[in-house]
Structures are given as structure tokens and as C-alpha cells.
A protein has these predicted regions:
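Signal peptide processing junction and immediate N-terminal pro/mature segment
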Residues: 18-37
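Edge beta-strand at a domain terminus
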Residues: 37-43, 183-277
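Predominantly extracellular/secreted and cell-surface proteins with exposed
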Residues: 76-204
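A long-range scaffold signal marking pre-active-site subdomains of enzyme folds
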Residues: 37-46, 55-64, 139-140, 144-159, ...
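Positively charged n-region of N-terminal signal peptides that target proteins for export
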Residues: 1-4
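Tryptophan-anchored aromatic micro-motifs
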Residues: 40-76, 86-97, 103, 136, ...
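Bacterial N-terminal signal peptides
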Residues: 8-21
Length: 277
């Protein structure tokens, strides 16, 4: 339809008026969105500050190979500190338990567990569905071996490899896993590992972080007390159902140490799980 000049002029004024209104409304919307983002950011910063301090650590990693299903339950601490605007997670391991689906007992000494010393690393934080989420990235950590590049350097296969170290101080290469099949049949495996784990956890209340662990660790057997054990435990893969690999952190005092954690383990954490898949 042809418009007259007057109609066009009126339409232009109307459009300008609507445009001015839209700009004003858009500015209000933008301001509201900006305020919402600022509020979300303030909430995240406040919740992130609440992470600071020492947390007791419990995690389970479910592994399986062709013959054996295994749970490794680890205990320790995570210390969250602030540095340069980032939250840094410093992890420490204290002791561990193992469970299998076979009549075989395997164990790792506290010294071997404490030899696992992941590097401190920044964690990622955000708010998901109103809950603070904390994500620690994988930090490849050698144990029983010294690696210049922990992320890519190959693991040894020879116990005489000069990179192999006695990290648990028992006079054997690598770290020692004790195996008990029967009272008469016991022995040791000497292994080197590259610990590669990451976690995602959500803050529940003020004093609990709950989530799951993702593990891509590598392990090689570099010796045994008896050749019969040499085929044991060379290749493990994490069971894909991550609900079998939970992590739980509980806030504790800064003065807590491994001895106190062991003494109060049952008060803080659920019973040790069994292989059930």
C-alpha cells in the first residue's frame, strides 16, 4: 500500500519513539542482566571463599581387568588456598584400602600411599543449578619412578632402570603391593605408577563436597618376590560407571594429620564398599 508523505513522516516519528522506548527498555534489560551476572559472580566468589581450608579426603576408584575387579579406597587431605585470584588445591594422601571380587587380599603400605604427592594445581569453580562445582584437572604424578616429564615420559619395564626409585623406603624397587592368596601363598609386587586422576565435586551445605573421580592411571609391574605373581595387576582400567568411583571431602581443622584421620575415619566417611558389579 502506497503511503503518503505525511504517513511516512508519522511512521518515522512513531518508529523513532518506539526505538527510543526500545533503547530504554533494552538498557533496563541489559542492566538487569548485568546485575544478575554480578549477583551470580558475587555468589560464586562467596561460595568459593568458603572452600578455603583443610578438607579430609575419601575417594574410591573402581578398576577392572580380564580377571579381577578392584576397588582402591584412598584417604588424605585437600588444602584449598587462594593465590593470585585462583583457588589452589594441594592434595596429600595418607592411607588406602583395597577390595577385590576374588579371594585375594592386596594391600599398600601407608608409606607407599604417602609417596603419592600430586602437584598443587588451580581448580575450576562455577555455580551449577545453585550449587558450587569444583573441578580439579588431571595432574600426572609418578610414584616409584622419577620422570622429567610426568605427563608423557614412558614408564620403566626393567627394575634396573635408573629412573626407578624406592619411594616407600622398603629396600625394593618402586612401591610394594602385598598379595595374600592363602596363608601359605603370599608375596609382593613391585610396581611403578603414573597417577592420573581428576575429580568433579559439588558443595553440599558448608562442610561437604560430593562428586566423582575420573582415573586414567598407568601401572607397570617391574618385579615380584616370586615369578608366580608377575602376571598380576599389570593393566587396570577404570570401570565406566562413575557412581562406583565417588569422592567425598569433609571440612576439618587445619591441625588434622594422617593419624587423626585414621582414628576418626568411621565418623567422617561411609563404610568401605565392596565390589558389587
Amino acid at each position: 500500500m502506497r503511503r503518503t508523505v505525511g504517513a511516512v513522516w508519522c511512521a518515522a516519528i512513531l518508529a523513532a519513539s518506539v526505538g527510543i522506548g526500545a533503547v530504554t527498555t533494552g538498557s533496563g534489560t541489559a542492566s538487569a542482566a548485568s546485575a544478575s551476572r554480578a549477583s551470580d559472580g558475587s555468589e560464586e566468589r562467596a561460595r568459593t571463599r568458603s572452600l578455603l581450608g583443610r578438607w579430609a579426603h575419601y575417594d574410591v576408584v573402581a578398576y577392572q581387568d580380564g580377571l579381577l575387579k578392584t576397588l582402591i579406597v584412598s584417604y588424605g587431605f585437600n588444602d584449598f588456598t587462594r593465590s593470585g585470584g585462583e583457588i589452589i588445591d594441594s592434595a596429600q594422601f595418607c592411607f588406602a584400602e583395597q577390595r577385590t571380587n576374588q579371594p585375594i587380599e592386596t594391600s599398600l603400605s601407608d608409606a607407599a600411599t604417602q609417596a603419592i604427592t600430586p602437584p598443587s594445581t588451580p581448580v575450576e569453580t562455577d555455580v551449577v543449578d545453585g550449587r558450587l562445582r569444583v573441578r580439579r584437572p588431571a595432574t600426572p604424578t609418578p610414584v616409584g619412578i622419577e620422570l622429567r616429564d610426568p605427563a608423557t615420559e614412558s614408564l620403566p619395564t626393567d627394575p634396573a632402570d635408573p629412573r626407578v626409585v624406592d619411594d616407600d623406603g622398603d629396600g625394593k624397587p618402586g612401591i610394594t603391593v602385598t598379595i595374600r592368596v592363602t596363608p601359605e601363598l603370599t608375596g609382593e609386587l613391585y610396581i611403578a605408577r603414573r597417577e592420573i586422576f581428576a575429580y568433579e565435586a559439588f558443595l553440599e551445605g558448608k562442610n561437604r563436597l560430593v562428586g566423582t573421580v575420573t582415573d586414567g592411571s598407568e601401572q607397570l609391574v617391574i618385579g615380584a618376590s616370586d615369578p608366580i605373581f608377575l602376571g598380576s595387576g599389570a593393566h587396570w582400567e577404570q570401570y565406566p560407571d562413575l557412581t562406583k568411583s565417588p569422592i567425598l571431602l569433609r571440612r576439618v581443622g587445619r591441625g588434622w594429620d594422617c593419624d587423626r584421620l585414621k582414628a576418626e575415619r568411621d565418623r567422617l566417611f561411609p563404610p568401605t564398599p565392596e565390589v558389587d558389579w
